Amino acid sequence: RAQRSGQRARALIQQMLTFSRGQRGEPRPLQLAPLIKETVKLLGATLPSSIEFATRLENDAPQAQLDPVQVEQVLMNLCINARDAMQGNGRIEVRLAATAHESQICASCRQAVAGHFVEICVSDSGPGIPPEVLERMFEPFFSTKEVGKGSGMGLATVHGIVHEHGGHVLVDS
């Protein structure tokens, strides 16, 4: 298990380096439910017992052409932000579903979002995101965390990976 975790860490670092150079990693057809289950299992082990971690996954959601390590990175970043927003207790839920959007706006690139998508949703029971933070949360190095507690790169990385794969980020707070 330790060796596998070490290999995963190495792969994540490699993907972050690849992403920083503006490359797409290695997209391939993926069934997302098994990947999400595995990632959630790893994340769940890092959460305090005062945080409930749940999933609702459509096992028959369509495949998507994605890099699995980058999907894992996005999930980890979103769940870590959710954990931190709840300040020690609450609920995080990860959902996977085929969905359609008609007139949404991407929170990170501000483009209109319409069409059919495979959607990964991370929600939490935290207090919500203040409007002034919503405006800047995807900017590189922007952070609401105290110095030394966050790099401000988590959501910027989410933005980059999601958009490199042709997706968008919707925020409801």
Kindly give the residue locations of the regions a language model identified.
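Core catalytic ATP-binding domain of two-component histidine kinases
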Residues: 1-173
